[in-house]
Amino acid sequence: MSTLLRQHAEQQFAEELHELKQNETNPVPENWEMSPQSVVTYLMGGKLKNGFEVSPKYIGNRRLMEIAVATLVTDRALLLYGLPGTAKSWVSEHIAAAISGDSTLIVQGTAGTGEEAIRYGWNYARLLAEGPSVGALVQTPVMKAMQEGKIGRIEELTRIGSDVQDTLITILSEKTLPIPELNTEVQAIRGFNIIATANNRDKGVNDLSSALKRRFNTVILPLPDSIDEEIDIVRRRVESFEKVMQLPAEKPALEEIRRVVTIFRELRQGATADGKTKLKTPSGTLSTAEAISVVNNGLAMAGYFGDGEIHAEDLVSGILGAVVKDPVQDK
């Protein structure tokens, strides 16, 4: 078993990716690892012709994944948009792993992200000693993706300042990255594209300019439609977490997962499941990702401070922490 706390998607699911490539029967775009159809099978799960079972990475509307993958065959970039905790980063990572075999070409967007994180930077010691040169140039993940024909990822695009966001316009429209200091440019090769993620809930985000919006095809990832779908997502992710962390606790009973998911869904909707009682909606999103965290925390509590079997009391503190984000508003 790997000692890594978290493997990249292409490492964790290497066997599945290998089997999909070995059983490929559809046309594969240049510099892609597999066909768009196989990428969707990798995301949604399924049984291959040789009987091999591919586990689902995304549980939800298959059509959304088909639209997302089809976008990346075109000249438009992909923007995964939605509430926090709707698997935007998870989907982005797995699409990049399936298409390029590399999900690590990533820029994490923050309020402090500058142009040099997207375009290129400089090794200032060499820049002062040699002046502008190829040796002094520091490549960014986006530049590497262009040169290698891979998928580049930008997380939390709307957290980046609007002026910095717009440095992507030339990259996405003309598929070139000018380097005027060296009187040259980097031209993207086939297979290159960008997957960006953004959420529509957090405060302090910067809206995309209309010019940049036109360069993206936006796919909105919703919260799970049904309670059974959400329970299945939580169960699968918790089982995966338990294997990695090797917690001294039994797998949580499905009923405990159902209890957490039901509480979260009722609070999100502002009413009990039967619709008879109205509830105050908290300030937090109470997403599926937070439900997973609550159950994981409950497992740790049960394993180290309980009898090894998860009970309601092991989940209470996690639920309280997820619900009460603002002590005043959520009182």
Kindly give the residue locations of the regions a language model identified.
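AAA+ P-loop NTPase catalytic core and its hallmark functional loops
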Residues: S2-Q246
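C-terminal engagement/docking regions of AAA+ P-loop ATPases
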Residues: G303-K331
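Short acidic/histidine-centered micro-motifs embedded in hydrophobic/aromatic stretches
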Residues: I171, I263, S317-G318
